[in-house]
């Protein structure tokens, strides 16, 4: 004759987090208050015989098992354990509010914009301390101003007639030493061209008045007297 095995899906309880001094009898004693117990065993190491810190309790009926699992973290033998149905597996312990550790997700809208960096250039990460933000530096856009000097009519207009005349007075016309025996014709003149043809019409008249005609000095030949 073959004996049929009883279904323990809703009656077998997993008990984890047990202290090493917990025994089968002490485990049974704790769960007796919830109902009849068919089996209570602490899993031990085969070589050392010491407890591995968990065990199993099989209650007589499903209602007793539900009462035993109502508190998921009971105190057994002076230590907080975790209790759950065996087919569901071990239930994680509930951490106290004062001991909860977590990293708060930083929303991009709550980040201050340091140094004028736009918000879309800052990409916060989830695992960084609040307030510590590594900004993502965007390449600087090219400047719209030209790096070259603007040679326009406005630039030439700043040179007045007096400044232009003073500049030309620094270079007086003189005869070379080799031509001291010759006399050049007096009264000849030449016109100085405009600095640029792109100058404004108003500045062209000022430049013409500034440069004018240059009358060279009469040369005297000392040796021909």
From Swiss-Prot:
Q: Where is the RRM domain?
A: 11-88
- InterPro entries linked: Nucleotide-bd_a/b_plait_sf, RBD_domain_sf, RNA-binding_reg, RRM_dom
UniProt keyword annotation of Lyase present = no
One example GO MF annotation: pre-mRNA intronic binding
Tell me what induces its expression.
Answer: Up-regulated by the myogenic factor myoD during gastrulation.
What Gene3D superfamilies does the record tag this protein with?
Answer: 3.30.70.330
One GO cellular-component annotation of the UniProt record comes to:
cytoplasm
Subcellular location per UniProt equals: Nucleus; Cytoplasm
What keywords were assigned to this record? Cytoplasm, Differentiation, mRNA processing, mRNA splicing, Nucleus, RNA-binding, Translation regulation
Q: Name one GO biological process term.
A: positive regulation of stem cell differentiation
Matching PANTHER family, A to Z?
A: GEO13361P1-RELATED, RNA-BINDING PROTEIN 24
The job of this chain, per UniProt, is described as: Multifunctional RNA-binding protein involved in the regulation of pre-mRNA splicing, mRNA stability and mRNA translation important for cell fate decision and differentiation. Plays a major role in pre-mRNA alternative splicing regulation. Mediates preferentially muscle-specific exon inclusion in numerous mRNAs important for striated cardiac and skeletal muscle cell differentiation. Binds to intronic splicing enhancer (ISE) composed of stretches of GU-rich motifs localized in flanking intron of exon that will be included by alternative splicing.
Its UniProt domain note says:
The RRM domain is necessary for mRNA stability and mRNA translation regulation.
Which protein are we looking at?
RNA-binding protein 24-A
Record the organism: Xenopus laevis (African clawed frog)
Q: Which gene encodes it?
A: rbm24-a
């Amino acid at each position: 004759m073959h004996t049929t095995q009883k279904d323990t899906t809703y009656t077998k309880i997993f008990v984890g987090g047990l202290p090493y001094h917990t025994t089968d009898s002490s485990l049974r004693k704790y769960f007796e208050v919830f109902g009849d117990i068919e089996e209570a065993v602490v899993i031990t190491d085969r070589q050392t015989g010491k407890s591995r810190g968990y065990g199993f309790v099989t209650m007589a009926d499903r209602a007793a098992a539900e009462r035993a699992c109502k508190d998921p973290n009971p105190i057994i033998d002076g230590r907080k354990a975790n209790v759950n149905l065996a087919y569901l597996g071990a239930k994680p312990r509930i951490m106290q509010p004062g001991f909860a550790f977590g990293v708060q997700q930083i929303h991009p809208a709550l980040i201050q914009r340091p140094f004028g960096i736009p918000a879309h250039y800052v990409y916060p990460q989830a695992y960084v301390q609040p307030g510590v933000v590594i900004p993502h530096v965007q390449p600087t856009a090219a400047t719209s101003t030209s790096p070259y000097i603007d040679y326009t009519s406005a630039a030439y207009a700043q040179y007045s007639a007096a400044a232009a005349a003073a500049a030309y007075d620094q270079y007086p016309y003189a005869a070379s030493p080799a031509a001291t025996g010759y006399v050049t014709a007096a009264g000849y003149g030449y016109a100085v061209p405009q600095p640029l043809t792109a100058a404004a019409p108003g500045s062209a008249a000022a430049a013409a008045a500034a440069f004018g005609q240059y009358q060279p000095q009469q040369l005297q030949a000392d040796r021909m007297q």
